[in-house]
Amino acid sequence: MKAKVAVLEEFNKPLVLKSVEIPEIPSGGLLVKLVASGVCGSDLHIIEGKDPRVPLPIILGHEGVGEVVEINGEKKDLNGVSLRKGDLIIWNRGVVCEECFYCKVIKEPFLCENRKVYGINRSFSEYPYLLGAFSEYIILEEKTEVIKLSLKVDLETMVIAGCSGATAVHAFDYLKDNLLGSTVVVQGGGPLGLFSAALAKYQGAKNVVLITGSLKRIEVAQKIGIDLVIKRDEFTEEERIKKVYDVTYGKGADVVIEATGFNSAITEGIKLLRKGGTYLIVGIATPQDKIPIDFYDISSKNLNVQGVWVSDARHFRKAVTFIEKHEDIFREMITHRISLEEINEGLKLLKEKKAGKIVINRF
């Protein structure tokens, strides 16, 4: 049996479509036929050679939902349900070792020293080869955390849980205060930013403000009920800051969430906060040029600045549950549905910020 795959062979080059033999499934592993695969902003960073974790060649794609085709042994999901052929599942993109200092002692597996990530640091040359979701089939290894999905779930919408959803949930773990009545500003209108904005709204934030440069993403934000959308390129930094201070009676935002993926957003984000506010850096996933930061502004305002790195099973599970309850909102985030053969065109749309969430639904 063969699988169609899209392989990155060289940085800054289009993905190459191939047909390859499906190898023997490792013990405890699953062969899964993709039903839907998400295209993520970090896929662009990978293609541009900005992520030092990435080996070549590689099948990209770390967000996926699919149907179990083959099981080598017994496999249970995170809820203890034994999996069978034909089950629909979603999987946690990161596979942790369960043995390192961060897994066993600190008990923060998202910091695992040996974390393997489908579609990010798993080479196409590494057995069992089919280790990314830009593929007709993917092979999930024994320690992969999966959740069996209901037949009623919108599978295309559910792919959002696998990366941006789980990472946003992780970020909200650091908010000690109740958001009821608060103002939350989200920098960046991609899936990570939109998921964060939706979480803030459903946790009681009075004002949710989204700063984004994409007209398409503004349309999506309005559909999901964001209170104020500021189009970045229509206002100067000073004007954007004033807009936030105007809706907070001159005090600034309680929480600001960086979801742009760019260091340049951080200096503005700190200025948007009230005294004692919290800044969550969620979108920075690759090394970038250094930027100047006024640490006096941080200390004199007694700010909490928290980095957020990926997610683990706890966040993944919550993201799946949240989407199950609010499918109608997250469905609005999907602006393009494409075939695997159209992946390079889809990546171009994403790079040009002409798309919200892109989902591959035809393989």
Question: Residues of each region from the PLM?
Answer:
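Local beta-strand N-terminus motif with an aromatic residue
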Residues: G181, I226, G252-A253, I343
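Mid-domain Rossmann-like dinucleotide-binding core that forms the NAD(H)/NADP(H) cofactor-binding site
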Residues: E136-Y137, S150-E234
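Glycine-rich beta-strand-centered segment in the early N-terminal region that forms part
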Residues: P23-S37, D51-K104, L131, S150-L151
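Short amphipathic alpha-helix with an adjacent loop that forms part of the alpha/beta core around
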Residues: E237-Y249
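C-terminal hydrophobic helical "lid"/dimerization subdomain
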Residues: M1, V255, T267-K271, A313-F363
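Cysteine-cluster motifs in flexible loop/terminal segments that predominantly coordinate metals
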Residues: C40, N92-T144
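A generic alpha-to-beta junction signature in SAM-dependent methyltransferases
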Residues: N178, T248, T260, L273-R274
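Glycine-rich phosphate-binding loop and adjacent beta-alpha segment
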Residues: A205, Q222, D227, F262-K325, ...
